[in-house]
Regions:
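Acidic-basic catalytic patches of nuclease active cores, encompassing PD-(D/E)XK
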Residues: 1-32
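Conserved catalytic cores of phosphodiester-cleaving nucleases, focusing on short active-site segments
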Residues: 21, 40-59
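Short acidic/glycine-enriched loop/turn segments that link adjacent beta-strands
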Residues: 34-38, 91-92
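Non-catalytic C-terminal interaction segments of nucleic acid-processing enzymes
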Residues: 23, 43-45, 88-141
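Short, charged, amphipathic alpha-helix that recurs within catalytic cores of restriction-modification
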Residues: 61-88
Length: 141
């Protein structure tokens, strides 16, 4: 079960990830996306960790990268807490401590989908990127 859904109360996948964090030593884990710019937070060894969650709908070998908008990356790096980017693929997931693992590339990306507004300009946005081949992929258990 891949842990991601934007619903306020969470879904089975969110509960799985919270359970996984608690099983691995985190305490007081809760959803925070209603009132913070990150999705989950919890304590480990007395320190607060914030989790930004991303969902990729294909296997990790198909995507080959982990992306985060440059604006969000800059914001999260300035937080006084530990910050982890959790990216979920259909086959595995990856956790990146964004304060201690610099992105491998900063690039611009244009969304491939046209919005419902036909006159909407497709504006490129800056993203930071880590390559999957250089990361440790974790199995769902």
């Amino acid at each position: 079960m891949r842990p991601f859904n934007d619903s306020i109360q969470g879904d089975e996948g969110d509960r799985w990830f919270i359970y996984w964090l608690e099983k691995n030593g985190f305490t007081d884990v809760k959803r925070t996306s209603q009132y913070c710019h990150w999705d989950l937070e919890g304590y480990y060894g007395g320190e607060l960790y914030c989790f930004e969650m991303k969902n990729r709908t294909f296997p990790s070998y198909r995507y080959n990268d982990v992306l985060l908008s440059k604006d969000k990356y800059d914001y999260l790096r300035e937080l006084p807490y530990k910050v982890v980017l959790a990216t979920f693929y259909t086959d595995k997931f990856v956790l990146i401590d964004i304060k201690h693992r610099s992105p491998q590339e900063i690039t611009e990306k244009v969304c491939k989908r046209q919005t419902v507004f036909k006159d909407h300009r497709m504006v490129p946005k800056k993203v930071v990127k880590w390559f999957v081949k250089d990361l440790k992929l974790l199995d769902y258990d």
